[in-house]
Design a protein with these regions (language model features):
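Short, charge-patterned binding micro-sites
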Residues: 40-58, 327-331
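Glycine-rich, mobile lid/loop segments that gate access to catalytic sites or pores
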Residues: 6, 66, 73-257, 388, ...
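C-terminal catalytic subdomain
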Residues: 271, 276-320, 331-338
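A short glycine-rich, hydrophobically flanked beta-strand micro-motif that places a catalytic Asp/Glu
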Residues: 37-41, 166-172, 245-249, 315-326
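Internal helix-turn-beta structural module
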Residues: 46, 318, 325-431
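N-terminal, positively charged regions that mediate nucleic acid binding
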Residues: 1-40, 45, 422, 428-431
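Conserved phosphate/anionic-ligand binding catalytic regions in large, soluble enzymes, centered on
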Residues: 8-10, 14-19, 115-130, 256-281, ...
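Alpha-helical support elements that line or immediately flank enzyme active sites
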Residues: 12-31, 126-150, 290-314
Length: 431
């Protein structure tokens, strides 16, 4: 019997994502000037205010206000009517030094004996449902919003009313074998200008103006946004876009008040959007604002790297990887594998886990080195998903009034998405 599964995403202008991006921009700034920085930075955003808090150990001095304002401006909060604007909002910092008790458990004379920054379990997941080994409902949800943001920033004349805050949700019908059959429902909620004004102060005139705005936005979503997103996918995914899709565009009827003025945003509140959209599993730890000594982040990336390479190598069509740690201990407590009965090798999931244990060094320092995580690569992860992205080499420049010369870094983004272990896995599993 078929079933429906739903995933959601939020835009870079969503208040929780504004907070995530500020936290990761601060992390990048510290790492650009001091790669050994230990950072745990949280951000709160609300009407006209940004609050920064957390723990840092670094030789770098960062102008946190300047970094926060630059992120807010880059996202697009540049108008006073948003009630949250880059130049005028208040930025309060309560960032202080990292606890010595934590630091003594993390740092070691031999860096490869570096202990995990905390206890916990982390998960990685991959499926052959899409070309990037991600769940399709989540991937579509991300694509809808990243394309909407592209239009807002680069082709404003096409949808000139767009504001930064937005959410999406996609429901897909699957058959018993987990194969997508069709897209059932698409939800788009996008913040917008009040671009149709009522003829007078009567309720009827206000309702008519609101309906005119909603009709225009719904028409643009269906005629402009949906075809552009469809074109990004292979034919088998395009075929899922039928004329039977149910669309809900701004279903409340109006979305003018939004962003941090509409809802308070906090770092780390969109962990399912950040990962697998409800597929697989999540250990509960957020990513943004944390340097790679925090296994909440680094081990989750490493687990995704393992899962993706296992599926790409043909070990299974779907894989969940769990790894767990104790604070101050380098080696993980366990590695667990679940192939959901979709394994392509004559091994139990426990036997697959044993091979994975031998193939991948999951000590925190080994993960940092393998995935090049001691670089300023994190701002780009903080919107539209940490997983399923395209690895790429970029040049990043950091300028601070506290440093005489800019720092220019060549860094590799999304290294955990590379398929660089496929050959080793095939050899190990005899594929």
């Amino acid at each position: 019997m078929s079933y429906l599964f739903t995933s959601e995403s939020v835009s870079e202008g969503h208040p929780d994502k504004v907070a995530d991006q500020i936290s990761d921009a601060l992390l990048d700034e510290f790492l650009a000037y001091d790669k050994s920085s230990k950072v745990a930075c949280e951000t709160l955003v609300t009407t006209g205010q940004v609050v920064l808090a957390g723990e840092v150990k670094s030789s770098a001095y960062v102008d946190v206000q300047e970094v926060a304002r630059a992120v807010i401006e880059r996202i697009g909060y540049t108008k006073s009517e948003y009630q949250f604007e880059a130049k005028s909002c208040g930025v309060f910092s309560a960032i202080h030094e990292q606890s010595g008790d934590i630091n003594r458990g993390v740092e070691r004379q031999d860096p490869y004996n570096q202990g995990a920054g905390d206890q916990g379990m982390m998960f990685g997941y991959a499926t052959n449902e899409t070309e990037n080994y991600m769940p399709l409902a989540l991937d579509l949800s991300h694509s809808l919003l990243s394309e909407l943001a592209f239009i807002r920033k680069n082709e404003i004349e096409k949808m000139p009313y767009l504001r930064p805050d937005a959410k999406s949700q996609v429901t897909i019908e699957y058959d018993d074998n987990g194969t997508p059959l069709r897209i059932d429902t698409i939800v788009i909620s996008t913040q917008h200008d009040e671009f149709v004004l009522p003829a007078d102060d009567s309720k009827a005139a206000k309702d008519a103006a609101d309906k005119a705005m909603q009709d225009r936005i719904a028409a643009d979503v269906k005629s402009l946004l949906i075809p552009r997103v469809m074109a990004q996918y292979p034919p088998q995914v395009q075929a899922l876009f039928t004329d039977k899709i149910t669309y809900h565009v701004n279903p409340t009827g109006k979305f003018v008040i939004g962003g941090p003025h509409g809802d308070t945003g906090l770092t780390g509140r969109k962990i399912i959007v950040d990962t697998y959209g409800g597929k697989g599993a999540h250990g509960g730890g957020a990513f943004s604002g944390k340097d790679p000594s925090k296994v909440d982040r680094s081990a989750a990336y490493a687990a995704r790297h393992i899962a993706k390479n296992l599926v790409a190598a043909g070990v299974a069509d779907e894989v969940l990887v769990q790894v767990s740690y104790a604070i101050g201990v380098a080696k993980p407590m366990n590695i667990f594998i679940n192939t959901y009965g979709r394994s392509n090798v004559k091994l139990t999931d426990g036997e697959i886990a044993e091979k994975v244990w031998n193939l991948f060094d999951m000590r925190p320092k080994a993960i940092e080195d393998r995935l090049k995580l001691r670089n300023p690569i994190y701002f780009e992860t903080a919107s539209y998903g940490h997983m399923g992205r395209t690895p790429q080499v970029v040049i990043k420049e950091f300028n601070s009034r506290y440093n005489t010369a800019p720092v220019i870094c060549e860094v590799e983004l999304f290294t955990w998405e590379k398929l660089d272990y496929v050959d080793q896995i095939k050899e190990e599993f005899g594929l």
